[in-house]
Swiss-Prot record:
<comment type="pathway">
    <text>Quinol/quinone metabolism; menaquinone biosynthesis; menaquinol from 1,4-dihydroxy-2-naphthoate: step 2/2.</text>
</comment>
<dbReference type="Pfam" id="PF01209">
    <property type="entry name" value="Ubie_methyltran"/>
</dbReference>
<dbReference type="InterPro" id="IPR023576">
    <property type="entry name" value="UbiE/COQ5_MeTrFase_CS"/>
</dbReference>
<keyword id="KW-0808">Transferase</keyword>
<keyword id="KW-0489">Methyltransferase</keyword>
<dbReference type="GO" id="GO:0009234">
    <property type="term" value="P:menaquinone biosynthetic process"/>
</dbReference>
<feature type="binding site">
    <location>
        <position position="58"/>
    </location>
    <ligand>
        <name>S-adenosyl-L-methionine</name>
    </ligand>
</feature>
<comment type="function">
    <text>Methyltransferase required for the conversion of demethylmenaquinol (DMKH2) to menaquinol (MKH2).</text>
</comment>
<comment type="similarity">
    <text>Belongs to the class I-like SAM-binding methyltransferase superfamily. MenG/UbiE family.</text>
</comment>
<dbReference type="InterPro" id="IPR029063">
    <property type="entry name" value="SAM-dependent_MTases_sf"/>
</dbReference>
<keyword id="KW-0474">Menaquinone biosynthesis</keyword>
<protein>
    <recommendedName>
        <fullName>Demethylmenaquinone methyltransferase</fullName>
        <ecNumber>2.1.1.163</ecNumber>
    </recommendedName>
</protein>
<dbReference type="GO" id="GO:0032259">
    <property type="term" value="P:methylation"/>
</dbReference>
<feature type="binding site">
    <location>
        <position position="79"/>
    </location>
    <ligand>
        <name>S-adenosyl-L-methionine</name>
    </ligand>
</feature>
<keyword id="KW-0949">S-adenosyl-L-methionine</keyword>
<dbReference type="InterPro" id="IPR004033">
    <property type="entry name" value="UbiE/COQ5_MeTrFase"/>
</dbReference>
<dbReference type="InterPro" id="IPR014122">
    <property type="entry name" value="MenG_heptapren"/>
</dbReference>
Length: 245
């Protein structure tokens, strides 16, 4: 029987979870932390707000959100890999963030009511889901009117020489790093496949608009190796005005 994308991705993350954080730093040359820090600055998270991190993995972004909203806020992280969540739960306990909660679940069907969170984020996870649009629709659904949907993801550089180097790195070097540091050549071969097949920045921005998000911002990082996409969910008052105009 043919293995689905969802099944394969689940197997990948259930296997590499122990070395995932180390490999993130190796693969991105530590730049992923700076990308997330700049993204958080652009989000302008305030104390007391609420956030959901979809495909939260080992909870680095959920932890950053938890620190930003403070003890009066509320943060949820959701992932379908229980092994990844086990690492995240330990990190949250070490940080003593009692207002950050992790849940096992599917990004394709978020177990939350409409209009629940001020922010809904996904970091380096959208490329791994079976249906990009379905996940974006779900993220928009659970975001409050006026709230923000944010994606930080690998991207595809457009500068000719850098683009060639980037593709060479992902096709040939990254799987070798996976074998060296995580003993997982096949798993990191899959991750490079998902990266190279992911939509470019312009297409992803259009997808944000297609699920009803407005004021879409795009910020490339490190020559386009990664990019942030941020969109705002219209308030119901704005939607009503648009209908009557």
């Amino acid at each position: 029987m043919t293995e689905t994308k969802e099944e394969r991705v689940h197997q990948v993350f259930e296997k590499i979870y122990k070395r995932y954080d180390v490999m993130n730093s190796v693969i991105s040359f530590q730049r992923h932390k700076a990308w997330r820090k700049d993204t958080m600055k652009r989000m302008n998270v305030q104390e007391g707000q609420s956030a959901l991190d979809v495909c939260c993995g080992t909870a680095d972004w959920a932890i950053a959100l938890g620190k930003a909203v403070g003890p009066t806020g509320h943060v949820e992280g959701l992932d379908f890999s229980e092994n990844m969540l086990s690492i995240g739960k330990k990190k949250i306990a070490d940080e003593r963030l009692d207002h950050v909660f992790l849940r096992h679940g599917n990004a394709m069907e978020l177990p939350y009511a409409d209009d629940t969170f001020d922010f809904v984020t996904i970091g380096f996870g959208l490329r791994n889901v079976p249906d990009y649009m379905q996940v974006l629709r779900e993220m928009a659904r659970v975001t409050k009117p006026g709230g923000k949907v944010v994606c930080l993801e690998t991207s595809q550089p457009t500068i000719p020489v850098f683009k060639q180097l980037y593709f060479f790195y992902f096709r040939h070097v990254m799987p070798l790093f996976g074998k060296m540091f995580a003993k997982s050549y096949d798993e990191y071969s899959w991750l490079q496949e998902s990266t190279l097949s992911f939509p470019g920045r312009d297409r992803l921005a259009q997808m944000f608009k297609e699920v009803g998000l407005t004021d879409v911002q795009v910020k490339p990082y490190s020559g386009g190796a990664a990019a942030m996409h941020l969109g705002v969910k219209e308030s119901y008052d704005e939607e009503s005005r648009n209908v009557t105009c």
